[in-house]
Amino acid sequence: MARYPYSPALKPPGNWTSIDFADPRLAPAIRLMIQGIQTDLSSFTPPDGLTLNRKQVTVWDGETISCYILEPEGGCPKLPTMLYCHGGGFFLPIQTMMMHLAAQYALELGIRVYLPEYRIVPEHPNPYPFRDCLSIMEIIQKQDVHYLLYGESAGGTLAAGLALWARDHNTKPANGQCLIYPVLDNRCSRYASMRLYSEAAWPLKNNLTMWREYLKNGKMGLDDYLVPMTAPNLAGLPQAYIEPQQIDTLRDEAIAYAKRLEQADIPVTLQVIEGSYHGFDADTTNPFVQEIVHRRIEKMREMLKGNSE
């Protein structure tokens, strides 16, 4: 991996992001990696004050997926809610660091967090990841609670697409969308950051592979929801918190999406994190990471409060 001026406050990024997930020769190793992630996740214990349930949920095509639900102990049925769309390039399942972040959000905001284990590529390209998350959003909407859409990396694509879907289908809108180093556009050559940081923590070759595998069924009439940057009109969407990392291939598309939202008169908080990289928040106890996480929490608190007054 090329050397970049990452903040000394952060651990260097790991090497797993340089794996070519589309290389069939690596398939056995990738399966072992996924099994290891799942084993680690199975040992996760929520902090005091929270409960964790894993439910099997029937989704759009009649199949079932797992959905983790974190919530305060003794919480009322109609708690404010977050739909957390996890990252992983559409190739990887929920990782333990994501559960730690979800638990922190649930505890500090006093909310219920849904973490769906949506189906992943290569076995399940579009529309499975988006439709699976849409099924969970519809469950939340029926509860008639304030809710947030949250997604990191590939999950940012899903969260942004769900916000567009809710607008276009006139269903209950989210109070806000929180997009953390999000994937938003498959037209990678449009962005200078793709060239500047092509070998950074989320390398260009993996980004290209991700889009190729995710969209290999075509867009199936879901164009704007699968690739949110292609939506011609962003008016009427929820307010947004967008957090690109300075040293990331995805930086410029996140900034461009924030500017488009602003042009559509959508309130946007854009936080470019200096010296940071894709997936930096995996080190959840790091003081630098915690400072950024608390910024997110305060913004999400504002989002929930703003629509409840």
Which sequence ranges carry the predicted segments?
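Catalytic nucleophile-loop/oxyanion-hole region of alpha/beta-hydrolase
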Residues: 95, 101-102, 114-148, 287-290
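Hydrolase active-site cap/lid region
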Residues: 164-219
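A glycine/proline-hinged amphipathic helix-loop "lid/cap" segment
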Residues: 1-72, 304, 308-309
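Short beta-strand-to-loop junctions in surface cap/lid or active-site-entrance loops
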Residues: 67-78, 229-234
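Short beta-strand/loop motif that positions the catalytic acidic residue
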Residues: 242-244
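Gly/Ala-rich beta-loop-alpha elbow adjacent to hydrolase catalytic centers
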Residues: 151, 155, 159
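Catalytic active-site module of serine/aspartate enzymes centered on a nucleophile-bearing elbow/loop
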Residues: 285-309
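Short beta-strand element of the alpha/beta-hydrolase
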Residues: 78-87
